[in-house]
């Protein structure tokens, strides 16, 4: 679920964009196997595609893989995603409404968070928010790695958790509630969005 009412997003005007499907990088070969849709990789982390979905993989930008269709940028920077769109139409998507593992509000990139900075600062001044924690980083596939989850569960109730990268999948199923209408867990994106988290930290310092 993309946060529109809280922070707004240009993506929210796209009726066909519903949100995020899937979890950490190491699960893609299982999660994509039965996904009735094409998959577009724009950055890390691409694993060697399994035969069950290899014909649905597209890449663009800095990521590519032998045998997969790569969408190149035109001289003006534009990209033609017509082949991907046609593949999506062919596959048709889910035949009926399908629940995955749950619903989690996302879309808190640095521009979105800084767009409501006044609300956040007011909550701090009023004592509703005592501190911010950035819990970000990649995560391995080994079961039992619980540091991220333990940390977040023990964080004070008046704290906000900014998170990014695959480490978030260790705890983003937790319902930590909200503070002043803001979710206590704010998903800022993937590894590549670490710079955005730094910008938010500096702005709110």
Name each model-derived stretch.
Residues 3-4, 31, 124, 153:
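Structural motif
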